């Protein structure tokens, strides 16, 4: 009986990336080639048989889209001791009769890891390692920032302290946090040369392979990844302005401590890098005074002078408590002041805007406190979170009534409450005279002897399933003259559009704009018909007809045409090559694109009547309506008002009958 595994992915693309990583790792360690074959399953949870020439065989089943199944993965992680209910891009389990056994978690970052987005994912690493699940973070380096004309401006990089945090975490949780840095597909030759010593080799593949071959994971497997991660941080630090960050000598001390799992607060406190954080949003008059107070105390910067956190030596906390009492008066509790005075630990202060002008959560900020905890994973420090953004008044009421209840229903507050020792509020929306501090009492970690129940194959149907059907049908179809240029299901990162030119080379446009003027709308899918009839088909997918935008079809056409015709491609891969370069023959590419018609389609969950209405409502050239039945079968309805496109798609779908049968998809085209 073949062993069965499941990949619970953020979407179907992440599931496919995970299966590629797993099979590549096993091939590397065994030297055995393999095949991956779609087997009889259903469209919402497609299954694949993986067969290696050495006799190893197993089945991998995809479960795309988190938090829509009969079992809650975040709740399970909480029971295992995770302070956060954060999911990852791909969570791999071993399927038993009634349960699933967690094996590994994969995170894929191929968007530009800079600015506040660089720490958005920090909570995921903390969530997995706290639950004792091996976590592998794959990050592409050297992605290009584009100017307003979509020409390459410069590569973007994170603050060195962000990748440093993963290195620190890897020492605090041996064998549980591994970072793999790889060159971006749009990396320049110069940038590649700068960072080539930091790019991963194949050692980490031994650790991934061991999860599926029954071997022990040796620390030796991951040792080199730690060395590479350290090199990447050092290379980043070397590129930064000297006045903005620590000296290279200090960075080397920090890296040595992180690799050995030793505390690092002492290095930061003795480095004398002054913290100079600036607040960019409208704030209370007291907030600049708080920042000025911290500067007078000569608190130490972490990573660079402008990061939103600093560290304070324990010897300065009594003075800090005294000055905070003067600044905030009776709105600061005696309990908070006494705690601050009497604690014998160094203090990390994290500044969190947390909220947009209208009071909605700012998603990237949920990673700030996890990032601080990861940096100091080998230190025993206290953390105060200063929340200064314009949260709604009801939020403050809930925070002071029951912070744990608030955290149970909100990811931002979950990170703040569960990973801070205290919270200080200095926001314009806090009622005058309201107490502004919360002390977080230590909660016993809920490490339970629990198992993950087997997931049902039938989810709460939605846009994920529409996107999965389109992707399963159109992907891997080059032999039939069809190329999937873009698939961006929910949770996707819009990392790029690919296009096959007349020479068979793949040209890629990255860092996609959300719109191209008021006339353009970024599609969810782009399909290239490159055979006799040359068409670029842009598709908008939605769950329901009512959520479909009026007149979106022409806007899809405009976006894709504007991008491919007038926008510069950033990278190119020759036919049958694995290497990407920036050497693009613009003349060949422009000529190839000019030969195509640009058409549009929409895809929704629905019946024949809704298919017809979606075609009219969207003003597009074709529509797909998809019905999901409780028994797992799928009905796919296709309609088009464009004779050429209708014939092309029907002919193509007829070549996919075997695939449709395996996925239990019933096709019906209507006039």
Over which residues does each language-model region extend?
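Compact beta-rich and alpha/beta scaffold cores in large eukaryotic transport/transcription complexes
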Residues: 9-13, 21-47, 138-144, 196, ...
């Amino acid at each position: 009986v073949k062993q069965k595994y499941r990949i619970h992915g953020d979407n179907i693309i992440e599931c496919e990336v995970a299966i590629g990583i797993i099979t590549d790792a096993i091939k590397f360690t065994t030297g055995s080639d393999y095949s991956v074959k779609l087997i009889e399953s259903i469209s919402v949870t497609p299954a694949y048989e993986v067969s290696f020439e050495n006799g190893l065989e197993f089945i991998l089943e995809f479960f795309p889209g988190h938090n829509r199944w009969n079992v809650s993965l975040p709740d399970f992680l909480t029971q295992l001791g995770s302070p956060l209910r954060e999911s990852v891009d791909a969570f791999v389990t071993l399927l038993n009769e009634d349960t699933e056994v967690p094996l590994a978690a994969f995170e894929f970052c191929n968007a530009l890891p800079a600015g506040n987005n660089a720490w958005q994912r920090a909570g995921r690493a903390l969530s997995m390692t706290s639950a004792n699940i091996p976590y592998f973070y794959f990050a592409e380096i050297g992605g290009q920032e584009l100017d307003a004309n979509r020409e390459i401006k410069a590569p973007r990089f994170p603050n060195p302290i962000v990748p440093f945090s993963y290195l620190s975490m890897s020492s605090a949780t041996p064998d549980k946090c591994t970072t793999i840095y790889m060159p971006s597909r749009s990396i320049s030759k110069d940038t590649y040369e700068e960072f080539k010593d930091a790019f991963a080799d194949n050692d980490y593949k031994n650790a991934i392979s061991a999860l599926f071959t029954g071997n022990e994971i040796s620390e030796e497997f991951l040792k080199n990844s730690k060395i590479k991660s350290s090199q990447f941080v050092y290379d980043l630090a070397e590129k930064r302005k000297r006045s903005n960050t620590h000296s290279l000598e200090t960075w080397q001390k920090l890296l040595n401590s992180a690799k050995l799992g030793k505390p690092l607060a002492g290095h930061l406190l003795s480095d004398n890098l002054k913290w100079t954080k600036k607040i960019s949003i409208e704030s209370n008059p007291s907030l600049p005074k708080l920042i000025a107070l911290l500067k007078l105390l000569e608190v130490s910067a972490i990573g660079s002078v402008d990061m939103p956190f600093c560290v304070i030596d324990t010897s300065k906390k009594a003075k800090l408590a005294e000055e905070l009492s003067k600044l905030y008066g009776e709105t600061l509790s005696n309990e908070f002041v006494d705690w601050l005075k009497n604690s014998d630990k160094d203090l990390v202060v994290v500044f969190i805007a947390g909220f947009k002008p209208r009071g909605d959560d700012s998603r990237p900020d949920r990673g700030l406190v996890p990032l601080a905890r990861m940096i100091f994973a080998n230190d025993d420090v206290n953390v105060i979170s200063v929340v200064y953004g314009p949260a709604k008044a009801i939020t403050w009421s809930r925070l002071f009534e029951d912070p744990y209840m608030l955290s149970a229903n909100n990811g931002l507050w979950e990170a703040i409450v569960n990973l801070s020792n205290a919270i200080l509020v200095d926001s314009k929306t806090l009622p005058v005279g309201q107490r502004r501090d919360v002390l977080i009492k230590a909660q016993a970690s809920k490490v339970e002897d629990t198992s993950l129940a087997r997931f049902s194959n039938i989810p709460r149907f939605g846009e994920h399933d529409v996107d999965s059907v389109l992707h399963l049908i159109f992907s891997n179809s080059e032999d039939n003259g069809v190329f999937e240029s873009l698939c961006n299901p929910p949770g996707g990162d819009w990392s790029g559009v690919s296009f096959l030119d007349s020479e068979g080379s793949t040209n890629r446009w990255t860092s996609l704009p959300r719109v191209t003027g008021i006339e353009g709308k970024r599609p969810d899918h782009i399909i290239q018909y490159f055979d006799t009839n040359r068409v670029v088909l842009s598709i908008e997918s939605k769950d329901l007809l009512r959520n479909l935008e009026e007149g979106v079809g022409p806007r899809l056409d405009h976006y894709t045409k504007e991008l491919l015709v007038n926008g510069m491609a950033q990278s190119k891969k020759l036919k049958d090559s694995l290497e990407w370069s920036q050497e693009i023959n613009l003349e060949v590419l422009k000529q190839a694109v000019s030969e195509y018609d640009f058409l549009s389609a929409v895809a929704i969950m629905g019946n024949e009547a809704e298919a017809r209405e979606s075609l009219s409502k969207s003003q597009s050239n074709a529509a797909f309506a998809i019905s999901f039945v409780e028994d797992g079968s799928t009905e796919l309805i296709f309609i088009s008002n464009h004779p050429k496109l209708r014939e092309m798609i029907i002919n193509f779908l007829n070549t996919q009958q075997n695939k449709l049968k395996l996925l239990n998809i019933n096709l019906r085209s209507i006039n």
